[in-house]
Amino acid sequence: MMIAYATLGKNPYFCVLKLIIMKKPFFLFFLVIATLGLQAQDFDLPCANLDYKNAVQTVLLYADGNQNKEPVIPLDDMTGRLTLSFDLLGSEGDLLNYTFIHCTHDWMPSDLQRNNYSVGFDYGRIDDYGFSRNTLIDYVHYELRFPEEDMMPLLSGNYLLIVYADDLTEENLFFTRRFMVLDEKVSIHVTVPRYCDDLTLSDTHQQLNVTVSMPDIMTSNIETYGNLTIRQNGRWDNAVMGLKPSFVYPDYLSYEHNPLTVFEGTNQFRRVNFSNFYFNSENIARIYQTDDYYVVDYAICEPRARKPYLTYEDIHGEKYIYVADDGKETATEADYAWLNLFLRYPAPLTHEDLYVMGAINDWMFNDRNRMNYDYKLGGYLCQLLLKQGYYNFMFVTADRDSDQVHTDLTAGNHWDTENVYRLYFYSYNPVKACDELIGYTTAQSH
């Protein structure tokens, strides 16, 4: 069963990208294939986390060997710090390449020639792969450690990783993922007060008060050149970008008492763990096997919009891929299963679509994680193909006109929800003509 992908509505980070890729020789089964010439590619490409092939599954991009560590690496110690892993469904793999481009603070392509932000080759090959073993669903697992010495970023800032086959054309794209290179020069301090400046939001929202200490690089143009980005958990849909300070002091910038730093409190994420197909963990109604695949039925869910807040441990919407069998290798012996989710709801929404949000679908909103209303059952259904592991997820709505995502109708909003906020401070370098990432931190709301 294949899933058709479609991005959600308008993409604010849609951009035109012109890539020039210099081909280098490669060897396959002792056959030398000559170096291809310089070829220019010209097509539209969003600088966002997106999948372009149905076969792409379980993409992980993380730092320092930790699946849940964001792909942010230091400029002065980059080699091999990032790990990329993913699966392609089926019994035959593809010869895949990767490259990256430098982006602005708000995820548009930088106006830089490649030799200004990268040293070495223009692309690399992903040649570490293995075939699934003893699984009902066949797949090919790929892994890559990068950056490598023969293709290394030169500047700090935002980067888009691009994985593709053959020549870099729109038809050959497999997926794209964001990562960052940090040249830390400032300190970011965050507090989350109990009450918002707008007291009417204090029970449902969280407001961040932020200061950026930068005594060594303070310039008279910092209000123009400095930009702050704030993300809630792993989300990009509600990220605040290009934030300017409310007040400028001699040695720090203040982003306190700013309505743009107010976020919906949301709720704790729901959890599902099917790392073991022979044990029904919390909230799993049943697990069964067909001739072709495993099926995991999650317990019937009820909206939490009007229910009291309950605190329990989650991993803030992330996922952790593993198989609970010491004798199995997760990379190639973990199987896939269809996860069935059902949210009881009295009637279909008229102006919103309902989605399953989280790293369970790489924080994307597309046909894959959009729920469909079943009149006979009286609720929304969704079926997701997932690799064995532990997942967090949340039911959310997306307005069909604005694409804005909210939790008030499905999960509810609470001031005391445990959220993780990620903050990035960029400074535009007029000499290098690019946005440099010079500050990064994470903070928990409670």
PLM region descriptions:
Residues M1-D44:
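Bacterial Sec-dependent N-terminal signal peptides
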Residues Q41-D76, D183-L199, I315-K328:
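Short, compositionally biased P/S/T/A/G/V-rich stretches that sit at domain boundaries
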Residues D44-N49, V181-H205, W415-I438:
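Low-complexity, Pro/Ser/Thr- and charge-rich linker/hinge segments at domain boundaries
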Residues D51-H102, T200-M214, K328-L341:
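Contiguous beta-strand segments within globular domains
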Residues H105-W107, M151, A165-F174, N276-N283, ...:
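Short acidic/polar inter-strand loop motif in beta-rich domains
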Residues V119-E143, W236-P245, N340-Q388, R400-P430:
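Aromatic-rich carbohydrate-binding modules that target alpha-glucans
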Residues D138-M151, S156-D166:
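Ligand-binding face of N-terminal immunoglobulin V-set domains in extracellular IgSF glycoproteins
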Residues Y298-T350, I438-Q444:
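Basic K/R-rich, polyanion-interacting modules in nucleoproteins and related proteins
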